[in-house]
Regions:
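Long, low-complexity segments enriched in small/aliphatic residues
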Residues: 1-75
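Long, contiguous, secondary-structure-rich segments that constitute the structural scaffold
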Residues: 53, 73-89, 93-200
Length: 200
């Protein structure tokens, strides 16, 4: 923006006014209820501020040891797993409330789905928040109605940020966590064994 700042008349920006625009006449003309002509905070459909049932805010970040789902079967990604599951990072206070220890296998669940994960306790996440990286290869079990590898897509909603942007709202997700049932400990994950999958 240096040229624009030094001489805004000669170096107009690529906007309808040639200036920095906080209000968009174009977006205003769409007359959308969920997207105003200027930056505006809308209450998310699901967040800690309106929680009713689930008490933990799930952040599904980009993974450190793979690229989305690529290389999930590679050495570094496998090295980061806990008992072949994607790690779930949880604050010590939340872990203590649920009697969880490092490397415990847990079920992460909400009204949309259920998945397995391995516990990693850390002060790097605040109380009330859990983190599971995206990209674990989808390993569903129909009979048990659970995803065995730690793929957070089974928990997130399929609602766009607005009718204008259509971006995902994957970080607007509430979940809870509990120790795993003995019935699930032997469920295999896709990158280790393909034989269990029931995809038909």
């Amino acid at each position: 923006f240096e040229d624009f700042i030094n001489d805004p008349i000669s170096n107009k920006l690529n906007t309808s006014s040639g200036k920095i625009e906080i209000v968009s006449k174009v977006i205003k003309s769409f007359k959308l209820k969920d997207c105003k002509k200027h930056p505006f905070w809308f209450e998310p459909y699901e967040w800690i501020g309106n929680k009713k049932r689930f008490n933990l805010h799930l952040i599904s970040n980009q993974p450190e040891f793979k690229l989305h789902g690529q290389l999930d079967n590679a050495f570094l990604s496998k090295l980061n797993k806990i008992k072949n599951r994607e790690p779930l990072i949880i604050n010590p206070i939340d872990a203590k409330k649920r009697k969880l220890k490092n490397n415990d296998l847990v079920e992460v669940y909400n009204q949309r789905g259920r998945m397995l994960a391995g516990i990693r306790i850390s002060n790097k996440v605040m109380e009330g928040v859990v983190v599971v990286s995206t990209g674990s290869w989808f390993s569903p079990y129909k009979k048990e109605k659970i995803e065995a590898h730690g793929n957070p897509n089974v928990l997130t909603g399929d609602i766009p940020t607005s009718s204008f942007s259509q971006a995902p709202t994957s970080n607007t997700t509430l979940v809870d966590v509990k120790k795993i049932s003995e019935d699930y400990k032997n469920l295999k994950t896709l990158i280790y064994d393909f034989s269990h999958l029931e995809l038909n």
